[in-house]
Structures are given as C-alpha cells and as structure tokens.
C-alpha cells in the first residue's frame, strides 16, 4: 500500500514541477541573452489558459490525433510512478525496468510523430519527420549505454543498477563511466536542447505534431512533454547519480523528494548554461554530431566484454 501511495505521489509531484523546470530553461536563456524574458511561472499560466479554452478538431482527424495527448500523458505519468525518484527502490518495479522505459518512450514518440505525419499540415509533417530522425539518432546510443551498465550490474532494473553503482559493486568501472558519459549526452539530446534542438521552438521544429491540437489536448501534450524532460533527467540520476536517496519507503521519502528536486534543479541549470553556449544545427545534419556518442557507448560495451 505504501508503494502505491508513493508511486501516485511521485507522478503528481513530477506533473506539478514539470512546468517550473521548463520555465527555468527559458529564464536562464533570457538572463544569458541579457533580456528580461518571461516569468518562471509562465508555463503554468499558458497551461491554465489552454485548459480553459474550448477544443477544436477537424472532422477528418484520425484516431492518432485524438489519442496522442492522453497516451503521451499516460506514459509520462506511468514512468513517473515507476522510476525510483524519492527512494532507492522503485515503487512499481515493472515500470522501473530499463527495457520497459525505452519501449514506453518509443511508443509515445511513435504516436507523437504519427500525429504530425497523419496531418495535412506541412509544418506538422516536418515535425513528425524530425521526431523519427531524432529517435534513430538517440535510441541506439541510449540502448548501448543501458545494456553495458545492465551487464555490469546484472539487471535491467533501474533501482538495482543504481544500487550497484552507489555501493561500487561493479566489475568494470571504466565501462560504467563511459556508459554514463554516453547516456548523459543522449539524455541531453532527448531533452531537445541546443545545438540539437530547441525545446520552445515553433511548429516547424520540435512542436510540429502539435500544430493541429488546441485547447485541453494541446495543454495535455505540452504538459506531457515537460514531464518527459524531468523524467529523462531523473532516469539519468537514478542510474548514475543515485546517492542521497533513502533506502526504504517512509517518512524519509520526504527528504528523498527534496534531494530529487535539488538534483533536477542542478541538472536543468547546467543544461541551460550549456544550451545557451551553443548555436543550433540543422536537424538533418545531426547525424554528423552523434557518431561520437555511439562510439563512446560501443567502447563502453567493449570494455564490459573485456572486464575493464
């Protein structure tokens, strides 16, 4: 029972703080550009306005357009319940498995891209193609890094992997370090940060598939995208930066929640500084910039085989 309560609490907290962290990136960008910029609470206001507006959809819209926002949000909330965020143990272990997480994110990405490709809007189609391209570039390095770490730790469970790294019970520490570097870069790409993308871009870039959405559906999709960013950061921290989380469920989970939020705050600030020190690249040439990440992940896998 305690695990179920903790799982729901994790989902609610991630949903509540996701707009804050997405707004934090915009504030950092404005400060580094020496301009005033929006308030850090602007994303909350935008979501409130969208939820209050009536929804408008084409009569010819397919099931993909209708099902994508609730599906995307459900996947994000499910992963928030399963990841070991506030404690070192996963509240729902079946949702905290690396393979489950990868396939869940792939499912959400597939419907997100399908929503754009299915539309007759040209910008939405470009956005859908962009999502599929980013999937091809990011997922191989993520999978290789995760499998290398899973082989060292003997499990694909996120909590177990984090415990092995926290206690130093790994037979190939160099491989784990390389896998962590590759996974960190892949997570940065997944966040949609410069130079790979711009998370607040307009319809012809990241938010292309949202061009045909409006009202509550658009708000739900935007909230799910913000939750996904927090979950990607939490995913990295749960495996490679697991220190500070309490071992059991209970009152100590409150301290674990504070530590989790501090980790997310530090990560988002670092990502914001890095992002605003780069210039954006065309998404069609991103493959030239991701070979190094795949190479690091492959090298980590090789080091696991030789036991280094």
For every predicted segment, state its role.
Residues 46-64, 122-126, 209, 213-217:
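Cytosolic juxtamembrane amphipathic/interface segments immediately preceding
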Residues 299-308:
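Juxtamembrane boundary at the C-terminal end of a transmembrane helix
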Residues 270-297:
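Interfacial loop-to-transmembrane junctions
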Residues 6-17, 93-106, 168-190, 253-256:
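Alpha-helical transmembrane segments
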Residues 91, 148-176:
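Juxtamembrane/interfacial segments at transmembrane-helix boundaries in multi-pass membrane proteins
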Residues 81, 100-115, 136-149, 153:
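Mid-bilayer segments of alpha-helical transmembrane spans in multi-pass integral membrane proteins
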Residues 25-54:
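Membrane-interface amphipathic/juxtamembrane segments adjacent to transmembrane helices
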Residues 58, 77-93, 112-121, 155-156, ...:
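Transmembrane alpha-helix boundary signature
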């Amino acid at each position: 029972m305690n695990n179920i309560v903790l799982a729901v609490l994790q989902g609610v907290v991630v949903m509540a703080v996701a707009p804050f962290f997405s707004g934090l990136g915009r504030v950092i960008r404005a400060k580094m550009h020496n301009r005033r910029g929006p308030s850090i609470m602007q994303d909350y206001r935008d979501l409130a306005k969208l939820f209050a507006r009536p929804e408008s959809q084409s009569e010819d819209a397919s099931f993909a357009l209708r099902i994508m926002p609730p599906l995307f949000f459900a996947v994000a909330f499910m992963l928030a319940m399963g990841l070991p965020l506030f404690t070192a143990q996963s509240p729902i272990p079946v949702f905290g498995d690396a393979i489950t997480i990868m396939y869940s994110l792939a499912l959400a990405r597939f419907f997100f891209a399908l929503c754009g490709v299915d539309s007759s809007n040209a910008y939405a189609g470009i956005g859908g193609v962009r999502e599929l391209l980013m999937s091809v570039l990011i997922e191989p390095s993520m999978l290789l890094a995760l499998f290398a770490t899973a082989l060292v730790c003997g499990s694909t469970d996120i909590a177990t992997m984090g415990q092995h790294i926290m206690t130093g019970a790994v037979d190939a520490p160099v491989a784990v370090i390389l896998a962590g570097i590759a996974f960190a870069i892949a997570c940065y790409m997944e966040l949609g940060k410069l130079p790979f993308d711009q998370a607040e871009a307009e319809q012809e870039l990241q938010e292309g598939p949202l061009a045909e959405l409006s009202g509550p559906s658009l708000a739900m999709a935007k909230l799910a995208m913000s939750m996904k960013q927090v979950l990607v950061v939490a995913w990295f921290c749960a495996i490679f930066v697991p220190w500070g989380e309490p071992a059991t469920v209970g009152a100590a989970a409150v301290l674990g929640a504070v530590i989790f939020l501090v980790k997310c705050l530090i990560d988002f600030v670092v990502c914001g500084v890095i992002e605003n020190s780069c210039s954006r690249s065309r998404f069609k040439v991103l493959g030239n910039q991701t070979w190094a990440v795949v190479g690091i992940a492959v090298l980590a896998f090789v080091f696991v085989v030789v036991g280094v």
